[in-house]
Regions:
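Sequence-level detector for compositionally biased, low-complexity segments
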Residues: 1-179
């Protein structure tokens, strides 16, 4: 069973409890947090984040997300501050701290890159296509309008959640735990 340590002071308890509430709210409401203002490049032209609704939905079809590439010591390496959405759209300006919050062994953005791709299920042969899901309203119900920008916003929101999580965790005082 998990053991909840007894902290040495009330101030430590209040700090941990407040951080815990903040983290719970942040993670439970991840789809409603303010999206991180990423830099959008569409067909080589920068589009301000606030104008992402002007992007033609036909340019938002995703097949497989990936990190952009950069050269480090003469070798190709992932540029984890930039995600190639498709051949038309790139998102950049992802803070390094967004990659520091890990869910298991990967960041939240790593999980998105892995999961939001067109991919057939090996056992059933059913194709998992996030484009169809977004066209059907992204889980908002039978009468929902298509949400072609859902994944753009989700990437930005996961970035916000990851950065804020790191801020909350790093704001905690060192704990004096009683045995």
């Amino acid at each position: 069973l998990p053991r909840i340590p007894l902290v040495a002071s009330r101030a430590d308890f209040v700090a941990v409890a407040t951080a815990g509430r903040g983290l719970a709210d942040l993670h439970q409401d991840y789809e409603t947090v303010e999206p991180w203002e990423l830099i959008l490049t569409v067909d080589g032209k920068e589009v301000p984040w606030a104008q992402r609704d002007t992007i033609d939905p036909a340019l938002l079809h995703v097949t497989k997300l990936r990190y952009a590439k950069t050269r480090v010591d003469g070798k190709q390496a992932d540029d984890r501050s930039s995600i190639v959405y498709n051949e038309h759209v790139t998102l950049s300006g992802i803070p390094e701290t967004a990659q520091d919050y890990l869910l298991g062994s990967r960041s939240g953005l790593d999980w998105l890159i892995d999961r939001y791709q067109v991919k057939p299920d090996k056992a059933s042969g059913i194709v998992n296509d996030p484009n169809e899901w977004m066209a059907e309203g992204a889980g908002q119900g039978n009468m929902a309008a298509p949400q072609p920008r859902y994944l753009l916003d989700l990437i930005a929101r996961v970035t916000t959640v990851s950065v804020r999580t790191q801020q909350i965790v790093h704001s905690l005082p060192p704990l004096d735990v009683r045995d």
